[in-house]
Design a protein with these regions (language model features):
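N-terminal secretory targeting modules
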Residues: 1-56, 60-67, 77, 111-116, ...
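Short, flexible loop segments at the rims of nucleotide/cofactor-binding pockets, characterized by
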Residues: 30-34, 93-98, 147
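Conserved SGNH/GDSL esterase-like catalytic core that processes O-acyl groups on lipids
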Residues: 52-54, 60-141
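Alpha-helical cap/lid subdomain in secreted, periplasmic
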Residues: 102-251
Length: 251
């Protein structure tokens, strides 16, 4: 009996070790240097080149699983956009702490710049950090919103950006596993679009994007964080198309 238990234990350990090895190898394959942004792929498009874009977000915007490289660097190097990356992993939209989205957007250096577009990540961290969801208000003034709630923070960012930065706003959602909290945020994001005339890039709800990751384990390091390959082939093309659409309207 002891031999049987020992053999089973060895088998289980072997399977686990194999799974971990495959997982690590998939990430390495997805982060090969050949997938990095490369200026040789630059093809000038006047609607994108030299535009000033502010990115506000957390780990997906930062590139937490791809050595700090995300779609931001792809857009900068391969489309010649002037990008300002205000991204910190693990941070939430809501909160009075200095690293929350709602506090970082108020940095003085940002208010001194002229941006053609603000792109804000719909954070996947608010639910994990137990932030209250909140609700959409009737008011429009940014001082009316409760920034300690996620929806209040979203409304504040929209109002502040329109008033202070005078720029159009694009919120983007992120691919991730099923999460009722995040699903409810996406629902309310569309409600805010009706109220505030914002743009949405719904990667979370994009059927094509979600299908790709089912068949290629090297595109993502986990359920949410892309590798370089994932940024190159999933996020960046979606962003380029959406940004072109938005900026074409502004001309």
């Amino acid at each position: 009996m002891k031999k049987v238990i020992m053999l089973i234990s060895v088998y289980i350990v072997g399977k686990l070790a194999s799974a971990v090895t495959n997982f690590v190898n998939d990430i390495r394959k997805g982060n090969k240097s050949s997938f990095k942004p490369n200026s040789q792929f630059f093809k000038r498009e006047d609607v994108l080149a030299d535009k000033n874009i502010l990115f506000l977000g957390s780990s997906i915007t930062y590139g937490a699983a791809s050595h700090g490289i995300s779609f931001v660097e792809f857009l900068n190097i391969e489309s010649h956009m002037n990008t300002t990356k205000e991204a910190l992993s693990g941070t939430s939209l809501a909160g009075t702490e200095k690293n929350s989205y709602v506090q970082r957007i108020k940095k003085e250096k940002l208010s001194k710049n002229k941006f053609d577009l603000l792109i804000c990540q719909l954070s996947t961290n608010d639910g994990r950090l137990n932030k209250y969801v909140g609700e959409i208000k009737k008011e429009y003034d940014h001082n009316a919103f409760d920034v300690e709630t996620t929806i209040g923070a979203m409304e504040y960012i929209i109002s502040y950006a329109k008033l202070t930065l005078d720029t159009p706003i694009l919120f983007y959602t992120c691919i991730r596993k099923a999460d009722p909290y995040y699903e409810f945020l996406v629902y309310n994001l569309y409600k805010l679009k009706e109220k505030r005339d914002i743009e949405i890039l719904d990667v979370w709800g994009n059927q094509w994007a979600n299908e790709q990751i089912k068949y290629d384990n090297t595109l993502f390091a986990d359920d949410a964080h892309p590798t370089l390959k994932g940024y190159r082939y999933i996020y960046t093309p979606l962003f380029k198309e959406k940004i072109k659409n938005i900026l074409s309207k502004e001309i």
